[in-house]
Amino acid sequence: QWTLAQHLALSGPQAPVATGLLGGPEFTARSLSPRIHGLLARRHGLRAAYLRFPSAQGARDLEALLALGLRGLSVTAPHKRAAAAAAATLSEAARAAGAVNTLLRAERREGPVWSGHQLDAEGLVRGYSDWRGAASLALLGSGGAAAAVLLAARELDWREATVYARSRAPAAELAQRFGVRARPLQELPAARAELLVSSLPVDLPAELFPQPAGPTPRALDLRYGPQTGFQALARARGFAVRDGLAMLVHQALAQFELFHGCR
C-alpha cells in the first residue's frame, strides 16, 4: 500500500519530477533501483523523486499511477507482461519481447497514456559484452526477464537456446515467439550448457543442475546481492559465475535517460 506522503509528493507546484518502481512487494522491497536513480538525480542536480510502488495487481495500479502524474515507471516481476498489455504503444524491442520493464508517460489529446519500452535486453548487451558468443544456451524461466535474455542473445551471439520452465504454456509461447526450443525443467539434468542463465526468483535444486559444456562454461544469475545457492552450485559444477548487477545498472542508466534526458 502506498503512503499518503507518496501521494502528496506527486502534487503541488513544488512537486519533483516523479518516477518509480512497480512490482511485487517481495521484489520492490529489495531492489537497488531507487538507490541508483537517486544517485543519478543528485549527480545531475535534478529535483526528482523515485518511489517504490509494491503492487499485487499490476494493471489496475498502472492506471492509478498514470492518473497521479508520474513521468515514468520501472517495472519488475511479476508485472512486465501486464505492463506491455497496458501500454498504448510499444518500442520495437518491447514488441519483440512481449514484455516491458519501462513505461514512459505520453500526452495525447484524449489524455495521458503509457508507452512501453524494453531496456533489460540493452542492460544485458551492455553489461555482459565480454561474454559474447556461446554455442548453447540453457535459459531457466519463462517470464519477462527470460524474454529479455532471448532478445539480447541475438546481439550477444548466444546460440542454440532452450527454455526450461515448470509452467509449460508460458515456456511454449516464449519459445515460439523467439524460434527456440522449450523443455520441462525436469529435463535440465540431461542437458549440457556452455551458457546457463537463470531468470528464476528462487534457487535451482541441486538435482536439476545441468552439466557444463565447452572450454569456458558460464552461468549468469539475473538476481544480484549476496551469493545465491544457484551461484554456489554453478561454481561447484565448474561454471564461471556472474550475477545480474551489471544488467540492473545498465538498464537503469538507459531508463534514467528516457525519463530525464540525461545519463
Language-model-derived ranges and their functions:
Residues 218-263:
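Rossmann-fold NAD(P)-binding glycine/threonine-rich loop
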